[in-house]
Amino acid sequence: VTPQHPPLGQRLADALPELSPQETRAAEFMRDHLADLAVYNASEVARLSGVSKATISRLYRRLGFDDAEQVRDHVRALRSTGAPIAGEPPAGFSAHLARESDNLRAAFADLDLSVIAPLIAGARRIVVIGFRNSYPVALHLRQQMAQARDAVTLAPLPGQSLGEELAALGPDDVVVIIGFRRRPSSFERVVAAAAATGASVVLMGDDSVRRSAPSAAYLIVCPVDAVTAFDSYGAAFSVVSALAAAVLGESLASGRARIAAIGDVYDGLDELERF
């Protein structure tokens, strides 16, 4: 997608004022079912929108596509980048639950924390990095691991750059970088810079993060595919919970002592609600 080749939704919006009534009917159907166009052929779009196949073929050409296959490829490419594709949500939640279940199974099928957990538990310092949609996942991981051990920081904080966080790292440290799709353009440079410090780099993201994996020592892949317009991070947060629990399990005695000490401070400051 470029300014010269905008996404399908924008092409439809731009073209609507100039379309014939039949083309408008088809275009409005396409606009409301963008995600489904990844699988529909021209005959299906024609039938579902109540127009002729010739109308659909003509509309595709007006939108800059040669045929339905190009439209399908375009929509699939958009979805693979994580770009939201607006459309009517599926009726009920069965498809959503099925996809969430598939994501969880895929995330845990190849998950091996037997090396990563002790590595994190024994590190001098942990820096957890996340950008954009990955930031909440990074924040949650930092909060969970901070219950189990000290010296766990999150970066970048608002108004903060990464340089000061990375400059102090060395071979005894671990950097956990969360990088789900729609990452900033500097992402691969960040991974390489973290690895250049000598720290062990654990990289977590969807399958597309593999292109950044050469600089990382360890890779955790979590699918974020969804049947709705937006990516789902349910599997990612579940893996975060499992990872934090595994880190705690590596140093149970000290972890329990830290949790108890944190609880005492909570009580002293009256920070948490009571039941």
Name the predicted role of every residue range:
Residues F93, D112, S134, A195, ...:
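Residue-level recognition of alpha-helical structural elements
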Residues A121-V239, A244-L248:
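Glycine-rich phosphate-binding loops that contact phosphosugars or nucleotide phosphates
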Residues P3-V115:
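HTH-adjacent hinge/linker in prokaryotic transcriptional regulators
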Residues E250-F275:
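Internal, active-site/partner-interface "lid" segment
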